[in-house]
């Protein structure tokens, strides 16, 4: 009898632990102040701005701002290790009004970019917003490298799909989609 009670107690404890692990943390109070850093955007270095825009603007639907020429003293040269002889252009893209300038493209011309082989160290994760199959089909048509899909489990949105691909410059893009899509985060 004691063994059965102990086993029942362990099973209840394990069940509670599993349920807790699958339960998202409570939403922070609206009045709680955030004192951390604010994420602004991700930047991809590309070799051809117009070609990159066929992916980001025409296929994924992001809205580009103006394309500007970066000068010789651009901070991008230092942080991205771009030689002075390279020409650079810059463009930010928005994902609707609530995600303004959430991605940047930096075109680098006049130097060869290194091939991205081995471990991929960064990637954009994007809600496909019900268009995952169409986007992946178009990525294949564009000749991009497409990885296989995977089931993506969520405690609150059901089972979804995630699928990644590489742009022409080897930059990683991972799409995901749930049956109960989440709204975009406000920026």
List PLM regions with ranges.
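Bacterial N-terminal signal peptides
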Residues: 5-15
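Short, flexible, solvent-exposed loop/turn segments with mixed acidic/basic and small polar residues
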Residues: 4-5, 30-33, 113-115
């Amino acid at each position: 009898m004691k063994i059965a009670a102990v086993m029942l107690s362990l099973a209840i404890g394990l069940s509670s632990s599993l349920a807790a692990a699958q339960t998202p943390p409570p939403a922070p109070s609206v009045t709680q102040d955030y004192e951390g850093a604010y994420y602004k955007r991700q930047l991809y270095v590309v070799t051809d701005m117009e070609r990159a825009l066929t992916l980001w603007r025409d296929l994924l639907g992001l809205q580009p701002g103006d394309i500007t020429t970066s000068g010789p003293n651009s901070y991008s040269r230092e942080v991205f290790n771009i030689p002075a002889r390279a020409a650079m252009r810059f463009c930010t893209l928005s994902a609707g009004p609530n995600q303004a300038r959430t991605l940047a493209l930096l075109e680098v011309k006049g130097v060869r970019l290194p091939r991205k082989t081995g471990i991929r160290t960064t990637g954009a994760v994007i809600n496909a917003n019900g268009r995952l199959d169409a986007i992946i089909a178009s990525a294949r048509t564009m000749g991009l490298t497409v990885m296989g899909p995977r089931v993506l489990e969520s405690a609150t949105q059901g089972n979804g799909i995630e699928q990644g691909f590489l742009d022409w410059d080897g930059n990683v893009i991972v799409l995901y989609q749930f049956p109960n899509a989440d709204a975009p985060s406000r920026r």
